[in-house]
């Protein structure tokens, strides 16, 4: 093989985030296809792709060179930033490069992102090779300006600190000033004896990727492509050129090519991957292994005392627990993981001791008895047949991995504790990368290409919003996408470009739960990435790479449900303390509570963890779970595999006796499998059951059985053939017929693909059960906690308020005196609306109000509140929102008076503050002591009409709390529906039609699997609700009426809804209230007395009627005198459309009782 002549030493991948298009894998693959012996990836101030690059490089026979590009501040050049490429020559250089990158982030960003000071290179110079940055480097900038003195100063610095390790970088990519700089640099090199090196400053794989790269950069920088102000810093020539192309390009400077190979030879970094380094856990004089044994045995004693309070029972059950504990401890210690268990034990115990709610454990870790004994998990693995080997397999060495759920509010306290315990330099969270996803990339590309918003929005909306959606999947799921792609060239160009950018790394963030704890400093293992202020460090390696690099990951996950349970318990235990009852321990509630299972079987699971979706409610209704094992099964069954395979139907039929029980199949079963499969009615539902079947039938160890389970999941033919023979041979040794064994093996293999981790299912089922139990026994406290957790999502709060009303719970409007930021329950058991859920108020103003209330007691009225709170925090807009929401209802006569008095109250408060500032007591100070007098200072005005009050509630709370818009229509609606309210509806006889009316509270159009469209809307008349279905013809005709907050009158057939257990209507005819009036009303009656009539009133009456004269309803004026009553019929040209606007105008003018519609 001939000696290489060129190596690429400056290449950006998409991890550069500001530019760079290709991922590390394709870059390595391209270099390999070009026959390159080595490659450097030098992303901008990061090594995010290093682990992947290192593995891919060695896999492809390419030497990976570790490096990074930097923005450098050199005080000689003022505030100007220059470029520099830094390569690691050896492991010391790699360590120094890591520190250089970390330091750049830790000091905070400049306008151009993270920056290094040139002087930092002095302390971290060992093992580093520098490329000058070409025309954008400090020497390059000085050369182009002809500032020889500065050139000399810059070069002297590098000669002094980096002799033979500083190279003048030469680039020929057709960009401005490159050749001018290149000739000056070559002259400088000859004059000073400096080496030169050629790079192509690579940003993409092929030349025709240039346009996609320009768009990628424009997306980051916020420009459109044709914006004349857009910087044009790149050229189509910055692709990965071949050795031949580079040799031709630099044929006049062969030394620049030779030096690329020499540098590649000098760069020899070994990155240690695949080893684990745990921090040392303090164990005093004991070894870590002995300390673990001691703590586990002590913990088991406590657990057994709780599980079996009866001493005889405990004595009887102890041996199986002792045996299992000894086996697990032996495996943990042999595999070298005692420290891991102790570290997790410590921070979980600290959390519990410091009031941080912790989940019962999730994932396969719940299968460990040692974890249960150490109180890492809260499920007895023996009771629920959970297997340790599913978590830690002695036959397959891999790190244990506990996923620990913490209360969202307090999770950061635990991370702070860990940082305090092991050292802040040793603890970090983990980076995660955002990529250009299907929907967003269409919007981004469309914007950069300059397309109108509507055009881009139409295409983007065709991409389903499902997680993990890709453009390829979207083209399969949405038939309109391929249609418009083929029909419209602009659409095709946009989507083709979006495909090139889809999946490209866009930004970096913080992983939801991953935390690493290093035995020394984090930077000994990975560089750090920080936010713009240099805070919140995360490792630059993602969660899989950071483990491969040797750091052990701990998952500190935030689970909202734990926060809900904690809030509910705080309210419950406050009430119990008042009643002299002991606090409720949620971990000690019985798992067989009848009230809870009755509620579950009725599918009343809104707000219950994991069980609140429509599909899950349907499954619950069919399954009718009546024990905790059924709840574990629910979590495992509600997944696409079991639902689509028919497994769910078999499970339900077997539970209810409609299908014969067999273990696992009527034709092929064995009695020894009954104990394994009995909890799931003979269905192979869990991965643990797959392992137990292999153990029972064929004598597998549980470690070996776990390997079998994995092999079945991967479906590798050669591995499966090997496992089949092992399974058959083992079964024969156990005296089981070989054919039967193979048939059962086939069944196990079939179901293994659907099998779920029972440990995870059981742990989540426990949290589900706890929320179910709280909803059944403490409904007000539980629902108040749930609404608090969803305060920022008004739509969710609206649904939860509906659920409260369905449950018969009373919800009071927010109250400035008794209310809190959160929803809470008062002494009467009523839920008081959280002030924090009022839209447009914010936390600062609420804190100011509550502080003032805590200091001076309840507010007496609006003037008192304004005087006692900081009006800088509590401005007029916020006060208006509070009045509209009802929060001030107890402070004044009515909301209109409060609103009209607001200006005076704020003015008085301002005067009061000024007087206090100069130490005076003014008239307001006296008035504040006399509420009766203040009452008189409210503006004199009429109360708002009910609709205005309700609109204010809707605007600020997202719902109607003290009334309902339909109230004003009830009398009228009775005419259309024959007096039948929704709660009184019954299924209609075949062919018969009935009429229903109500306010639309939800409306949507969905597409069935067959591609048919169905409209669904929910009507509410305050007495009840009805779901209305509109199929194809009806939907085409009436879809424009399916709008939230519209009053609809619907005729159709009513039938039972198997899903909800209620009723549903299939619509034939739909009208809104205006159409219904036009159809059914016979006149508009206006009643006036002789005392009311004058020219002014008649003129205003004419003005009110004028805009509505294009209708069909005659107007009748009833004139009332003491001695007579007359009816005047307006002429045909005065027929009107009786809209809400007209009726409200007339009622405001004459009076509500004097305007009404007439019917036959």
UniProtKB/Swiss-Prot annotation:
First-listed, main subcellular location of the protein, grouped into a coarse class: cytoplasm
Pfam families reported for this sequence: DNA_pol3_alpha, DNA_pol3_finger, DNA_pol_IIIA_C, HHH_6, PHP, tRNA_anti-codon
GO cellular component term of the entry, any: cytoplasm
Coiled-coil boundaries: none
Places the protein is found: Cytoplasm
Annotated GO MF terms: 3'-5' exonuclease activity; DNA-directed DNA polymerase activity; nucleic acid binding
InterPro entries named in the record: DNA_pol3_alpha_NTPase_dom, DNA_pol3_alpha_thumb_dom, DNA_pol3_finger, DNA_pol_IIIA_C, DnaE2/DnaE/PolC, DNAPol_HHH, NA-bd_OB-fold, NA-bd_OB_tRNA
Tagged with keyword Metal-binding: no
Chain's role: DNA polymerase III is a complex, multichain enzyme responsible for most of the replicative synthesis in bacteria. This DNA polymerase also exhibits 3' to 5' exonuclease activity. The alpha chain is the DNA polymerase.
Complex formation: The DNA polymerase holoenzyme is a complex that contains 10 different types of subunits. These subunits are organized into 3 functionally essential subassemblies: the pol III core, the beta sliding clamp processivity factor and the clamp-loading complex. The pol III core (subunits alpha,epsilon and theta) contains the polymerase and the 3'-5' exonuclease proofreading activities. The polymerase is tethered to the template via the sliding clamp processivity factor.
Protein name as it appears in the record: DNA polymerase III subunit alpha
Organism expressing this protein natively: Salmonella typhimurium (strain LT2 / SGSC1412 / ATCC 700720)
Lineage of the organism: Bacteria, Pseudomonadati, Pseudomonadota, Gammaproteobacteria, Enterobacterales
């Amino acid at each position: 093989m001939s000696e290489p002549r060129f190596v690429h030493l400056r290449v950006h991948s998409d991890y550069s985030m500001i530019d760079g298009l290709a991922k590390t894998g394709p870059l390595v693959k391209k270099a390999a296809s070009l026959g390159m012996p080595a490659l450097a990836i030098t992303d901008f101030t990061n090594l995010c792709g290093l682990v992947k690059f290192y593995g891919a490089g060695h896999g492809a026979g390419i030497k990976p060179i570790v490096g990074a590009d930097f923005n450098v501040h050199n005080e000689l050049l003022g505030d100007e930033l220059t470029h520099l490429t830094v390569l690691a020559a050896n492991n010391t250089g790699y360590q120094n490069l890591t520190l250089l990158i970390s330091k750049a982030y830790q000091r905070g960003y400049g306008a151009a992102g993270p920056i290094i000071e040139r002087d930092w290179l002095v302390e971290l110079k060992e093992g580093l090779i520098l490329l000058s940055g070409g025309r954008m480097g400090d020497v390059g900038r000085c050369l182009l300006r002809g500032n020889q003195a500065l050139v000399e100063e810059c070069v002297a610095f590098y000669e002094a600190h980096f002799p033979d390790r500083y190279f003048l970088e030469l680039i020929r990519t057709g960009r401005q000033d490159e050749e001018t700089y290149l000739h000056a640099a070559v002259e400088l090199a000859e004059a000073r004896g400096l080496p030169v090196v050629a790079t192509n400053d690579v940003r993409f794989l092929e030349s025709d990727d240039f346009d996609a790269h320009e768009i990628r950069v424009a997306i980051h920088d916020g420009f459109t492509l044709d914006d004349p102000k857009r910087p044009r810093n790149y050229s189509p020539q910055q692709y990965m050129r071949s050795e031949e192309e580079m040799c031709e390009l630099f044929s006049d400077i062969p030394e620049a090519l030779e030096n690329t190979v020499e540098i590649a030879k000098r760069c020899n970094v070994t990155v240690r991957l695949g080893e684990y380094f745990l921090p040392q856990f303090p164990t005093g004089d004991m070894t870590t292994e002995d300390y673990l044994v001691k703590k586990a045995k002590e913990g088991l004693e406590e657990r057994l005392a709780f599980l079996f309070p009866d001493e005889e029972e405990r004595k009887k059950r102890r041996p199986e627990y002792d045996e299992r504990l000894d086996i697990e401890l032996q495996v943990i210690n042999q595999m070298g993981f005692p420290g891991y268990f102790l570290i997790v034990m410590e921070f979980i115990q600290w959390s519990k001791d410091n009031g941080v709610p912790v989940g019962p454990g999730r994932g396969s870790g719940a299968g460990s008895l040692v974890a249960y004994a150490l109180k890492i998990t809260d499920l007895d693995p023996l009771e629920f047949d959970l297997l340790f080997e599913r978590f830690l397999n002695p036959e397959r060495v891999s790190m244990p991995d506990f996923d620990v759920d913490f209360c969202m509010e307090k999770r950061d306290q635990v991370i702070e504790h860990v940082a305090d315990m092991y050292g802040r330099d040793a603890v970090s969270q983990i980076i995660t990368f955002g990529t250009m996803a299907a929907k967003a990339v269409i919007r981004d590309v469309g914007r950069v290409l300059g397309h109108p918003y509507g055009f881009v929005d139409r295409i983007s909306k065709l991409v389903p919003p499902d997680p993990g959606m890709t453009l390829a999947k979207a083209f399969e799921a949405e038939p309109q996408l391929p249609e418009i792609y083929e029909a419209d060239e602009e659409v095709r160009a946009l989507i083709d470009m979006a495909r090139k950018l889809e999946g490209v790394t866009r930004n970096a963030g913080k992983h939801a739960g991953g935390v690493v704890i290093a035995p020394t400093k984090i930077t000994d293992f990975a560089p750090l990435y920080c936010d713009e202020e240099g805070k919140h460090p995360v490792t630059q390696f993602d969660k899989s790479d950071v483990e491969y690099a040797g750091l052990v990951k701990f998952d500190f996950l935030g689970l909202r449900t734990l926060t809900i349970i904690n809030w509910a318990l705080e309210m419950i235990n406050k009430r119990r303390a008042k009643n002299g009852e002991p606090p409720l321990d949620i971990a000690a509630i019985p798992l067989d509570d009848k009230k809870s299972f009755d509620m579950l079987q009725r599918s009343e699971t809104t707000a219950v963890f994991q069980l609140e979706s429509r599909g899950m409610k349907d499954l619950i209704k069919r399954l009718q779970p009546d024990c905790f094992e059924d709840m574990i099964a629910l979590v495992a069954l509600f997944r696409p595999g079991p639902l689509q395979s028919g497994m769910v139907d078999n499970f339900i039929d077997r539970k209810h006796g409609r299908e014969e029980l067999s273990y696992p199949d009527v034709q092929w079963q064995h009695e020894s499998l009954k104990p394994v499969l009995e909890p799931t009615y003979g269905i192979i539902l869990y991965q643990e059951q797959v392992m137990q079947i292999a153990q029972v039938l064929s004598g597998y160890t549980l470690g070996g059985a776990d390997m079998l389970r994995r092999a079945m999941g991967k479906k590798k033919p050669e591995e499966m053939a090997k496992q089949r023979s092992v399974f058959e041979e083992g079964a024969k040794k156990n005296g089981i017929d070989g054919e039967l064994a193979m048939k059962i093996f086939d069944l196990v293999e079939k179901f293994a693909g659907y099998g779920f981790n029972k440990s995870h299912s059981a742990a989540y089922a426990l949290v589900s059960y706890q929320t179910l139990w709280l909803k059944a026994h403490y409904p007000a406290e539980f629902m108040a906690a749930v609404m608090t957790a969803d305060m920022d999502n008004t739509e969710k709060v609206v649904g939860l308020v509906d659920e409260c009303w369905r449950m018969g719970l009373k919800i009071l409007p927010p109250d400035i005196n008794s209310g809190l930021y959160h929803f809470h329950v008062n002494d009467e058991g009523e839920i008081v609306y959280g002030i924090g859920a009022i839209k447009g108020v914010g936390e600062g103003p609420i804190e100011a109000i509550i502080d003032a209330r805590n200091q001076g007691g309840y507010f007496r009225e609006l003037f008192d509140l304004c005087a006692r709170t900081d009006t800088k925090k509590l401005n007029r807009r916020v006060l208006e929102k509070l009045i509209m929401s009802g929060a001030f209802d107890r402070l004044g006569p009515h909301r209109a008076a409060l609103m009209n008095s607001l200006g005076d109250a704020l003015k008085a408060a301002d005067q009061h503050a000024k007087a206090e500032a100069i130490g005076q007591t003014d008239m307001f100070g006296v008035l504040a002591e006399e509420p009766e007098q203040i009452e008189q200072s409210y503006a004199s005005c009429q109360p708002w009409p009910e609709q205005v009050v309700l609109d204010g509630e809707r605007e600020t709370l997202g719902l109607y709390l003290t009334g309902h818009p339909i109230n004003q229509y009830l009398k009228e609606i009775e005419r259309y529906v024959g007096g039948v309210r929704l709660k009184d509806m019954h299924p209609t006889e075949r062919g018969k039609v009935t009429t229903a009316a109500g306010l639309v509270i939800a409306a949507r159009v969905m597409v069935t699997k067959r591609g048919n469209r169905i409209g669904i809307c929910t009507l509410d008349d305050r007495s009840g609700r009805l779901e209305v279905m509109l199929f194809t013809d009806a939907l085409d005709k009436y879809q424009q009426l399916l709008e939230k907050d519209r009053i609809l009158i619907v005729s159709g057939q009513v039938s039972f809804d198997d899903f909800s257990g209620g009723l549903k209507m299939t619509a034939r005819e739909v009208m809104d209230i205006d159409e219904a009036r036009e159809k059914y009303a016979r006149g508009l009656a206006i009643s006036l007395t002789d005392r009311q009539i004058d020219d002014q009133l008649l003129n205003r009456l004419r003005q009110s009627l004028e805009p509505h004269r294009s209708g069909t309803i005659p107007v009748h004026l009833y004139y009332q005198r003491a001695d007579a009553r007359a009816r005047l019929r307006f002429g045909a040209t005065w027929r009107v459309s009786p809209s809400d606007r007209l009726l409200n105008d007339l009622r405001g003018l004459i009076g509500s009782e004097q305007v009404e519609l007439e019917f036959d």
